[in-house]
């Protein structure tokens, strides 16, 4: 297959022996990114004279799909990804061959800036490329194609030329880093027992965002038979085959393209119940005209967590959602595994002490609450570092399970499936790399031993040596594509024993991972997200007059039919607790300020400052004891009132004395998604957590929210310092999603902002006695700064209807009577975007602190997508499209 470019009225053509496929972006502007796909005969194509042969005449392998991208000049462009070279690495039986991707080019359908390098062949020292046919004769043609490519290459000078920087060079680097493998058929991602009706194949397809529209169009328009090798699918992972005498051993590891994160540091699941670091590894033995296959999977603990690093405390586990809020998606994760593999045998390798202990306990708790018998056997196992080769404990523990699970066996001669694997081991440690790979190797060794026992063949030392190298290479490869460094423990697996050199290598790798964990590779993660189409402004390229483009048009026209609007109510409260915990009665007054007449709200957002006493011992301590007390008390009050309205904690966060918790009706917790949280220190120039902000972002249905709890600098004259702290938080508080506070639609910002009433103490106290709130507000520093536009841009505050909330003598209703005689002030405030309708804004008479808590209630409209209605519209549109096409024939 060869590739041609037409510069005028730009289009790209793929040429086979009989047909030409032409891809072009129309000049007519459209709201969607649409291209045309035309299939003509070779004779028709040869009549068109404007096309120029690309890549020095070298044959290409096919396309990985179409990509829509906004270039540096802010012009939106469509790029076609062409796979130019791949190295054949594995072919077994009648399975489609797997080749390692080595060279790709992105051809612009809009601009000619990068055209010159498209006319150059690959460097002369390129290794042979592969083809993707399944016949022996075509495999023999590989060498002929390589000779042709060499002839073309020799015609060109090898001198280096400088080309303009390509907008998609980061994707080129990613796709050719040695971890991507391609095939023409998605079935290469199936396990060997592909006849079994399970396994969602697309989770391993890394170019699904680029190729899905072409896949669908080829199927609907019956183009596939004309261009069987044009569309390529790629997965990321590691593939290797080793030959030993008359047998071979192979390993195919496929990294899932779904999950909360594909790079280091590790994390848990996403809102679709896919976990990060999920890898399916198939161990294949080919001997005596028979193929044996055994599959294992690895993946992080499937609840909402992430690993964090602190200069004070080192690594720690942060849970993004409460255990209760995580359980439903934890269950869904295991139900999908059960559907794909059958019985799930969980092997947990987490440490029971140290910072991993909290994650170990959470995993154990979630597994106990699984509502179905998907997990046949679950146990915790700690690998023995002195026995990297084989651990007798593991063999004893797994003997019955391996016998029950079995393995897949298939005859190459008659292509008959003789047995298949029943169930799968799901293995995890913190990052599912070093420890997990060692255990997977040990299990594969037990499987190999069983296979050879049934064949009545002895396992030789040579075979075990190859097996160790195979799994060590696999561990290193998977670890490198995720962390940039090899697998810890791989040298011990390779040698079958620990060594000084191996220990030093592991120490070096540990430091490498520590660095990557502390300073994540944002560029690599962004390149991955770009490839997968995960950024909010990314949309797939559609083909004109395809069913997909037709359906998108119908969905736009009928959007109001499946977009549902609903009323949503929020109760918010902020309280500087001065290190105190309110009594049960005070908690009731805080959350039910109108007693039994208080409405039940959909969402409760509680912000606390000085949840602990701000002394040095508390600031350097990582204890979350007070946080747990507040969470439990809040839930107790909310759930004791009405049996029909039960609440659960969605997420909470604490940074020293600053706390924020979000609670929602249990009936609504499944519509919450994209929950992340973050902090920003502002104390002592950003080094101390005694002042600063914590924030939680989340989606409720299709509406996004950002909740912030802040504590600013004290003292009446520190206005500029408070303004700077606001700027520091608004500019530098960044969520893991990359969003800042003002990137959200619905913002609720609460806290002890410490802005004071800037007037004489005696006058202020007299105005307080007269209840002259308007006059007091005219002296309020925050009102003044907001009018100037200095702080809280775009946020508004309800009218102040309550007396100043600071500073009181503890346990009394008297303003400060100490020698300092602080001026009464509204330090505690709640601000929101205009999307909120403000219903009530008051303070509570709770006297355990020198502040009074403030609460505000809001209502707003949120939107959700009715998936059943949307699916019905899509189904009707598809039927209408097919009828229209049939009537035009």
Curated annotation (Swiss-Prot):
Principal localisation: cytoplasm
Expression induction or repression: By stress.
Keyword check for Disulfide bond: no
GO MF term list: inositol-1,4,5-trisphosphate 5-phosphatase activity; phosphatidylinositol-3,5-bisphosphate 5-phosphatase activity; phosphatidylinositol-4,5-bisphosphate 5-phosphatase activity
Reactions this protein catalyses: a 1,2-diacyl-sn-glycero-3-phospho-(1D-myo-inositol-4,5-bisphosphate) + H2O = a 1,2-diacyl-sn-glycero-3-phospho-(1D-myo-inositol 4-phosphate) + phosphate
Annotated compartments: Cytoplasm
UniProt keyword annotation of Cytoplasm present: yes
Gene3D superfamilies associated with the record: Endonuclease/exonuclease/phosphatase
Enzyme's top EC category: hydrolase
Keywords: Cytoplasm, Hydrolase, Lipid metabolism, Protein transport, Transport
SUPFAM superfamilies per the UniProt record, alphabetical: DNase I-like
Coiled coil: none
GO cellular component terms attached to this protein's record: cytoplasm; membrane
Protein family according to the UniProt entry: Belongs to the synaptojanin family.
Record's protein name: Inositol-1,4,5-trisphosphate 5-phosphatase 2
Natural source organism: Schizosaccharomyces pombe (strain 972 / ATCC 24843)
